[in-house]
Amino acid sequence: MLINPSPEQFSLVYDATPCRENDTVLLFHRNEVLLSASGDSFVLPKWRDVRPLYPDVLVTHAFTFADRRVMIGQVEPVVVSGSLSFQNTRIFRVLTPETEGYLLNVAYHLSVWYATHQFCGVCGGATYPAPTERALICSQCGYVRYPVISPAVIVAVTDGDR
């Protein structure tokens, strides 16, 4: 089950500050994410670890969790060496601690939103990231697109054996 383990520490407030060396950076290619191996598991990599492979990648602030900024970007895979490798995003289910899996899953959903809204739904023009908020702006008609929140609740109602 995906539940925010610490809602008081999670912030979706957009931060336009450029990426810093210690920021967590999740680079996605389709349904894969670049992770760093750590023993028998994987950890979310820092900018200093992935920048040598992708020095020109455009990364965007996704969210902040407990003073830890998480950035996201879309890349084409390259031959990686060392501890870095692309893994299926479903790996979020086995990452430890559980908060790492939660962070990866939220970042993946935002990454998919950016990747699937590269063009305007009104006129078809190319979009670009808004400089001060989490939005995409059409370069032709100026339409502003925000991520859609689709909450869901699953409930089971029981009455004994019925």
Predicted regions and their residues:
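Short functional micro-motifs and their immediate structural scaffolds
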Residues: 125-128, 146
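Residues immediately within or flanking Cys/His clusters that coordinate Zn2+
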Residues: 114-117, 124, 135
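N-terminal strand-loop-strand
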Residues: 132, 136-162
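N-terminal alpha-helical interaction blocks
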Residues: 1-97
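Phosphate-interacting basic helix/loop segments used at nucleotide- and nucleic-acid interfaces
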Residues: 106
